[in-house]
Curated annotation (Swiss-Prot):
Induction: By brassinolide (BL). InterPro entries: Cyt_P450 (IPR001128), Cyt_P450_CS (IPR017972), Cyt_P450_E_grp-I (IPR002401), Cyt_P450_sf (IPR036396), Cytochrome_P450_Monooxygen (IPR050665). It is an enzyme of class 1 (oxidoreductase). PROSITE patterns: CYTOCHROME_P450. The chain crosses the membrane at residues 2-22. It is a single-pass membrane protein. This is Cytochrome P450 734A6. Heme binds at residue 474. Keywords: Growth regulation, Heme, Iron, Membrane, Metal-binding, Monooxygenase, Oxidoreductase, Transmembrane, Transmembrane helix. One of its GO terms (cellular component) is membrane. Cytochrome P450 involved in brassinosteroids (BRs) inactivation and regulation of BRs homeostasis. Is a multifunctional and multisubstrate enzyme that controls the endogenous bioactive BR content both by direct inactivation of castasterone (CS) and by decreasing the levels of BR precursors. Catalyzes the oxidation of carbon 22 hydroxylated BR intermediates to produce C26 oxidized metabolites. Plants overexpressing CYP734A6 show a dwarf phenotype, characterized by abnormal leaves with stiff, tortuous blades, undeveloped leaf sheaths, no flowering and bear seeds. Over-expression of CYP734A6 causes an important reduction of the levels of the BRs castasterone (CS), 6-deoxocastasterone (6-deoxoCS) and 6-deoxotyphasterol (6-deoxoTY).
Length: 542
C-alpha cells in the first residue's frame, strides 16, 4: 500500500471517529431533546460537550454566597440548597430535562413516578455511575454496586443491621455519648458564665465514628479505629478536591493534596488487608455469645463459604479481600456522615424552636426518670423525639437528591416515555418541601405532622424518602435513628441550649447536606446532679 493508501485509511478512520464523537456529543442530545419536547417536556438547551453544567454551577455558587436571613423560623432552604432545580422548576415545571455534559437527566418530583422508579419498576433502573473522585471517597461497596453482586453483598450484610443486633451495640454507644456530655459539662463549669459554646457538627463526628467502628469491626474495634482515622483524613482531602471536580483532569494532577490523598488510600488498603488477614487466621465466628455481628466478620464468613464451603445460589463471583476493603470504606463514609448530619440538624432545629425542645425534654424526663439515659425499651417510647427526628429528616435530608439510570427504554405513569441511558434526577429535598404533598406549612418545623406515623404524614407514601425507597433503601437507617435518639435524649436531659450569636443558617451540599459555616450552639447544664459515665452503665435498665 502506497502513501496515498495509508492517507486514505487514516482519513477514513478520522472520519469514523468524528462521526462517533458527533453522535455522542451532538446528534443524540438533539434527538433526546426532540423526544421529550414531543411529550411537552423541555428544559435549558443543551450546549455542546458541557450541557448545562456551567449554568448549574453558577446558580449553586450564587445561592451559597447568601446565607438564610434571620430570624430562623422558616426552613425554606430549597432555593439555596438545590438552586438549579428551584430556578428551572419555576420556568419549566416540576418535570424538566437538564444535561450533565452530554448525558440527559430528567428531573421528576411526582411521588407516584418516584415510587415506580425506586420500587415498582426498580429492575428497569440502575444506580448511575458516580464520579471517580466520589468513588475514591465512598468506596465501591454497597452504595455503588449493581446487579447480582449488589444483591449478594446486601444479603450478607443485612444481619449486622437487624434491630436485635444493633441493640447489642447501644451500651457502647451510650458510654461514648455520656463521655461527650461529661466533657461539655466540665467545659461549661470551667467558664464563669456557666455555659459553653460547642460546634456540634465537629463533636458529633466523633460520636458517630465510634458507633460506625464498632458496627464495622466488632471485636477488632481498636484496629478499626486506626483505619478509620486514616479514612477521616482521606475524607478531608477528597472533600476539598471535590470542589474542583469540574476542572478536567484535576484528580490526575500530582498536587500536594492529591499526592497525600493517594498515599492515604494505599495505607488504608494495606491496614485493612492486614486486619482482614488476622481475622481470617483467627477463624472468625460471627456467633460469639453476647456479641453483635459485625460487618467485617459477616463478610469474612461469606468469603470463606463462597471459596470453599457453602455455595451461593446467585451467579456471582466470590467475595474477595478487595470487596471487604471497599465495603468498610463505604460504610465509614455513608454511615458516619448520615448520622452526624442528622444529629447536627436535629440540635440546630431544637435550638431554633425552644417550645419543641422543652416538649422533647419533658418526654425524656417522664420516660427515663432521673437517669436520663434511655434503656432499650425506653427508646421505643420516645414518640415526640421520634417525630422531631422525622421532621428533621424531612426538612434536612442527608442526601438532597438521588439519580437512577434507565437500563432500557421504559414508560412511567402510563404516559412518560424515557429512552435508554437517560438519568432520572429525584430531588428528595424538593419532594420533602412540596406544599402540595405536605400542606401550606411545608417550610415550617412541625413535628406534629408525624403524630399518626410516617405513612399518614403526607398525601403520598413516597413523599418521605430520606433513606431512599425499595430494595436499595439505606441499610444503616435503623442504626442512624437509634444512635440519634439516644444522643439527643442524653443532651436534652442534661442541657438547655440555644443558637450561638455566631450561628449562620447556611445549609449547603458537598455530597451530603451540612452547615456551611458550622453549627455553634450554646449549652447550659441543667443541674450538677446527673450521674457521669463513670458512675453508671447506660442502657442496661428496663
Amino acid at each position: 500500500m502506497g502513501w496515498w493508501g495509508w492517507a486514505a485509511a487514516a482519513a477514513a478512520a478520522a472520519a469514523w471517529v468524528a462521526v462517533k464523537v458527533l453522535e455522542v456529543l451532538w446528534w443524540r442530545p438533539r434527538r433526546v431533546e426532540e423526544h421529550f419536547a414531543r411529550q411537552g417536556i423541555t428544559g435549558p438547551r443543551y450546549r455542546f460537550l458541557v450541557g448545562c453544567v456551567r449554568e448549574m454551577v453558577a446558580l449553586m455558587v450564587a445561592a451559597s454566597a447568601k446565607p438564610m436571613p434571620p430570624p430562623y423560623r422558616s426552613h425554606n432552604v430549597l432555593p439555596r440548597v438545590l438552586a438549579f432545580y428551584h430556578h428551572w422548576k419555576k420556568i419549566y415545571g416540576s418535570t424538566f430535562l437538564i444535561w450533565f455534559g452530554p448525558t440527559p437527566r430528567l428531573a421528576i418530583a411526582d411521588p407516584e413516578l418516584i415510587r415506580e422508579v425506586l420500587l415498582a419498576r426498580a429492575d428497569r433502573f440502575d444506580r448511575y455511575e458516580s464520579h471517580p473522585m466520589v468513588r475514591q471517597l465512598e468506596g465501591e461497596g454497597l452504595v455503588s454496586l449493581r446487579g447480582d453482586k449488589w444483591a449478594h453483598h446486601r444479603r450478607v450484610l443485612t444481619p449486622a443491621f437487624h434491630m436485635d443486633n444493633l441493640r447489642l451495640l447501644l451500651p457502647c454507644v451510650g458510654m461514648t455519648v455520656l463521655d461527650m456530655a461529661d466533657k461539655w459539662r466540665a467545659m461549661a463549669e470551667a467558664d464563669k458564665s456557666g455555659e459553653v459554646e460547642i460546634d456540634v457538627s465537629d463533636w458529633f463526628q466523633v460520636v458517630t465514628e465510634d458507633a460506625i467502628t464498632r458496627t464495622a469491626f466488632g471485636r477488632s474495634y481498636e484496629d478499626g479505629k486506626v483505619v478509620f482515622k486514616l479514612q477521616a483524613q482521606l475524607m478531608a482531602f477528597a472533600s476539598e478536591a471535590f470542589r474542583k471536580v469540574f476542572i478536567p483532569g484535576y484528580r490526575f494532577l500530582p498536587t500536594k493534596k492529591n499526592t497525600s490523598s493517594w498515599k492515604l488510600d494505599k495505607e488504608i488498603r494495606k491496614n485493612l488487608v492486614t486486619l482482614i488477614g488476622r481475622r481470617q487466621e483467627a477463624g472468625d465466628d460471627e456467633k460469639l455469645d453476647g456479641c453483635a455481628k459485625d460487618l467485617l466478620g459477616l463478610m469474612i464468613n461469606a468469603a470463606a463459604s463462597s471459596n470453599g464451603g457453602k455455595r451461593s445460589a446467585l451467579p456471582v463471583s466470590p467475595i474477595t479481600v478487595n470487596d471487604i476493603v471497599e465495603e468498610c470504606k463505604t460504610f465509614f463514609f455513608a454511615g458516619k456522615q448520615t448520622t452526624s448530619n442528622l444529629l447536627t440538624w436535629a440540635i440546630v432545629v431544637l435550638a431554633m424552636h425552644p417550645e419543641w425542645q422543652e416538649r422533647a425534654r419533658q418526654e425524656v424526663l417522664d420516660v427515663c426518670g432521673a437517669d436520663g439515659v434511655p434503656s432499650r425499651e425506653q427508646l421505643a417510647k420516645l414518640k415526640t423525639l421520634g417525630m422531631i427526628l422525622n421532621e428533621t429528616l424531612r426538612l434536612y435530608p442527608p442526601a438532597v437528591a438521588t439519580v437512577r439510570r434507565a437500563k432500557a427504554d421504559v414508560e412511567l405513569g402510563g404516559y412518560l416515555r424515557i429512552p435508554r441511558d437517560t438519568e432520572l434526577l429525584i430531588p428528595i429535598m424538593a419532594v420533602h418541601h412540596d406544599a402540595r404533598l405536605w400542606g401550606p406549612d411545608a417550610a415550617q418545623f412541625n413535628p406534629a405532622r408525624f403524630a399518626g406515623g410516617v405513612a399518614r404524614a403526607a398525601r403520598h407514601p413516597a413523599a418521605f424518602i430520606p433513606f431512599g425507597l425499595g430494595a436499595r433503601m439505606c441499610i444503616g437507617q435503623n442504626l442512624a435513628i437509634l444512635e440519634a435518639k439516644l444522643t439527643v435524649a442524653v443532651i436534652l436531659h442534661r442541657f438547655e441550649f440555644r443558637l450561638s450569636a455566631r450561628y449562620v443558617h447556611a445549609p449547603t451540599v458537598l455530597m451530603l447536606l451540612h452547615p456551611q459555616y458550622g453549627a455553634p450552639i450554646v449549652f447550659r447544664p441543667r443541674s450538677s446532679s446527673q450521674p457521669t459515665c463513670e458512675k453508671m452503665n447506660p442502657l442496661t435498665s428496663s
